[in-house]
């Protein structure tokens, strides 16, 4: 805890709901990296506020217009958070569910044939999805084996696996188990140098919690 004074740590902890007490099991410390996440109290308040509003966005009334303004502001804030000025933002039930949809859409829309590439470093959110949709689209799934010593994969690992007819590539930006990250920019450049039209899907769920994101640069 050398990075935090006791006062700062308490201030941070105070921002989250149920940090040290479960509403069902009583006192405990939430220390789970794959079965949920702590929620900011401000998020709980905001979610409750908007859940109570009966109007849908896209209608011709004051409430609907206000909701549309909130959505546009949220998208602008998200662009700043992720370091980009282009692209689209959309939401879903979970990161795993969204990644499955992205892999499905990429595999379905890519040119026929070729292969799909992922690594043993990845979370099942992309790894299992890529294997499934490779089989569904009659493509070979090729695994990039991670380095046990480094605990991750490198651009060279991908370069040795990617082929000119690689259609879809999945990359894990940071491990949800160890927090170890990869050089996404170098890996993406390695992929593009061999298969310029390959669709790259990045699982950045854990990375965004630990590091500053710069989507435009990576």
Task: Give the residues covered by each predicted segment.
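A short, hydrophobic C-terminal helix/tail in secreted or cell-surface proteins
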Residues: 214-218
